[in-house]
Every structure is written in structure tokens, then in C-alpha cells.
Amino acid sequence: MEEFQRYIELDRSWQHNFFYPLIFQEYIYGFAYDHGLNKSILLENAGDKKYSLLIVKRLINRMYQQTHLIISANHSNQNDFFGHKHKKNLYYQIISEGFAVIVEIPFSLLLISSLEAKEKKIVKSHNLRSIHSIFPFFEDKFLHLNYVLEILIPYPIHLEILVQTLRYWVKDASSLHLLRFFLYEYRNWNSLITPQKSISIFSNQRLFLFLYNFYVCEYESIFVFLCNQSSHLRSTSFGALLERNYFYGKLEYLVKVKTNTKDFCVILWLFKDPFLHYVRYRGKSILASKGTSLLMHKWKYYLFNFWQCHFSLWSPPRRIYINRLSKHSLDFMGFFSSVRLNSSVVRSQMVENSFLIDNPIKKFDTIVRIIPLVGSLAKAKFCNVLGHPISKSVWTDLLDSDIIDRFGRICRNLSHYYSGSSRKKSLYRIKYILRLSCARTLARKHKSTVRAFLKRLGSEFLEEFFTEEEKVLSLILPRDSSISRGLYRGPFWYLDIICIHDLANDE
């Protein structure tokens, strides 16, 4: 965003969310396509103001004519690899990627101003950026709650509804018409939630991810507003980009549809709950409450009606589950999380009489989802579907040090991410698969046996699979000491992780 603030000089006619003229500035496409494409197709001497109307006009004409463009000799082989279908849509991709950059500008500027206004009120903490900060929150709050609502955010939303919602932010009709053209040209809305393992340079993921995030923001804006109004503890950390007139209009319409009354307090009374917590990561969200099952069914009914009335989106019942925390495990971010009771027996002696006191203690437990993780390892060709390690044949052409470094890096990343697991047995199995797969890969390369290869390398081979923390602990504390066992076996959350590690991305 800082790059845009240096380059973009908007005059007064552009400052009220009129961003259509930016489409004709060449550096927008340079920012959007700084990887993969040759920028020479967008470079032309367009004067001091860098307007390039002729270039964009040519791109639009070629897009309608469905002709083919050879970018340069350096990229010709790459284009042939993607084939005729991707060449056909190259011009659309160039303009859509530039438009994705442009449409993010008003939201980025409002977000920056919102954060600057809150700097004095909210203490900054880089640890809150970590996705692992969710689990300490679970450990602190979920022990006192009863029910949880597991929500899979429905999709796809109707494209026209999305454009109508976006027009309250982007008031330039020309830009909205162009957006509508992009959406109806590419109807791959279903691919938003499912991550793609390999995204080509001809995909418009940036535009669709922006639209999906905008859709989720619209859904959460009203949802969090109701939570704040119905809770005794108001949220101060939620920052949403809201257009207030439109926002309260939506609320009044929702009340009218649901209760046939103008009294807004009625709908707030239905969801009165002093202990309500909401967490979301990607397309899955969790709503936990200390209330009763009846209250959770009210929230479920509200969400169904909200999606249907506001987004014209019907959500199947199986996308929302109501579960009791004491009897159900949460499947969230690669962990099975649950609240279990640990019995603590205390012997009490009073004069001549003695008796036992059983004190049940609640504990938040997290377990690694071993079956999906083994499936990911099998898909990446580290083992078979049963979890038996196999050699990584595509890496046999690499140097021994590179092979060991790749396996060690994946093992350390997994250990880093799943270090918060309460039970390490599953994590040890994953480490075993990677170590033996590495040994078999090296043995296959040198046409030797695994036993002979491990005997030649010795303990130095295993050290590559240790994390830095494990290496330090092994030097400071003996492995069989009680303190060391507690550090190795207990959960430990790293607050520097901002995304889930992808096994397929081994580079």
C-alpha cells in the first residue's frame, strides 16, 4: 500500500471512490504483475502523467477478438505449457489483476485510518497476528463454557448480490460494470474456499479472494454488532469497514423480516448472552457460549435467515452444528480440541477419621489429527496411504545435503506447528515417517541399504530433524530429567506462526 501512496496522485474528482481512471495507468499493472509476466507489454511512453489509454484499449480489443499474444521469447515455452485455453484468456487476466489492485485501494486506506485511530486505545502486540494465539484463548475461555456452534460459512454467493453490496463502497458505476463483466466471465467462485496447490500466473485468485473476504466482512459486521449489543463485555478489538447508513438499514430490514416490528430491542433480547465468544479462520468459524441449548438454536436460526434474507443464499443445515463441549471435540486448524475432566483425589485426615475428596478439574486438550496428516504425507509421496515411509524419488538427483535439509525443514515446520499438542505420540509418528523416508531416499540414490546408510551417518543425521529449541534443551537438561520430560511432552504454542504449513509446498 505504501507503493501506491507514492505513485498514485488522485485529483479531487477521484477522491470519492471514483477509481475507474486508475485502470488506464500502466504502473497499476506493473504492481499487479511483478511476478511471472513480462512487463514490456505494458510499457509505453505515455507522457509525464503515465496515462496509457492506448495499451489498455489494445488489450480490451484483443480480449474481445480472442486472439493470441506472444509475450516474449523468454515466456513462449511457459505459455505453450499452459496451453491454448490459458492463452485465450490472457488479456482478461491482465486487466482483472489490475482491477483487483485498484478495488483494494479504498478498503486499504480506510483500514489504515481506522488502525491509526485505534493506536492510542489498543496496545499493539505482534503475537496477536499468530493463528496459534487462538488456542491460548481457547484454553482460557472454553473451560467455563457449555455449548459451541461450528459454522461452515456458505458459498457461493450470487454474483449480482455481491456487486450490489460492493456498490456502497465503490461508487463508480463504470468500475462496477467492469467488475460485473469479470465475475460473469469467470464463474469459478467455488474455488475460493478450496486452496489450490499450484496457482498459475493466469489465475485471478487475488480478485476472488478479495471478494470473498469482503463477503465474510459483510456477514461478520452485523454478527459482531449483535454480539456486542447482547453481551455485557463489549468487543474492542474488532475493526470492520462499515458504511453506517447502509449498515443500520440492513439491521432494520432484518428486524422487520424476522419479527414484523420496528422495535430493534426485540431481536437483541433474543440473543442475550453475557458470555459469547466468536473465532474464525478461513471458511470455518466457531461460536461458543455459556448459555443453554435453546440459545444456540436461536443463533443457528438467525444465521440461516440472515444468509437467506441478505445474501439470497440458502445454507444446508449440515453446515452448522451445535455440540456440547464436554462431549464433543472441535475440529479446527488441524487439531482436535476438547474439554475433558481430570480427577484429582485428595486424602483428608481429621483426628481419627479420614476420607477421600475427589476434585474434578477441567482441562483443555488438543490432539493432532493424525489421519489427515498422514494423508497429506502420502499425497506428497513421503509414505503410502497406510503410513509406511517410502523414498522420495524426485529428489534423488539432488545433493545429499539438500535432501537432508529439505526433509529436516519439513519436519521442523511440522514440529513447530503441532508443538501445542497435548499428546506427542502422533507427532513422533510423523517425525518417524519423515526420517525413514529421508533415509530411504538417500539409500536409493547411493544404491545402498537403509541400515548401512544410517550406520555411516550416525547421530548427525538425526540432528537435522530437531528444532532449535530441542537442540538447546538437549544441551542444558538431560533427556531423562523430570523438567525435560515436562517440556518435551507438554503443549507449547509458538506465537510467530501466521499460516498453516502446506506439505505440498516443499520448496
Curated annotation (Swiss-Prot):
GO terms for cellular component: chloroplast. InterPro entries: Domain_X, Maturase_MatK, Maturase_MatK_N. Disulfide bonds: none annotated. It comes from the Eukaryota. GO terms for molecular function: RNA binding. Transmembrane segments: none annotated. One of its GO terms (biological process) is mRNA processing. It is found in: Plastid, Chloroplast. Pfam families: Intron_maturas2 (PF01348), MatK_N (PF01824). Keywords: Chloroplast, mRNA processing, Plastid, RNA-binding, tRNA processing. The keyword Chloroplast applies. Its main location: plastid. Belongs to the intron maturase 2 family. MatK subfamily. Usually encoded in the trnK tRNA gene intron. Probably assists in splicing its own and other chloroplast group II introns. This is Maturase K. It comes from Browningia hertlingiana (Cactus). The lineage of its organism: Eukaryota, Viridiplantae, Streptophyta, Embryophyta, Tracheophyta.
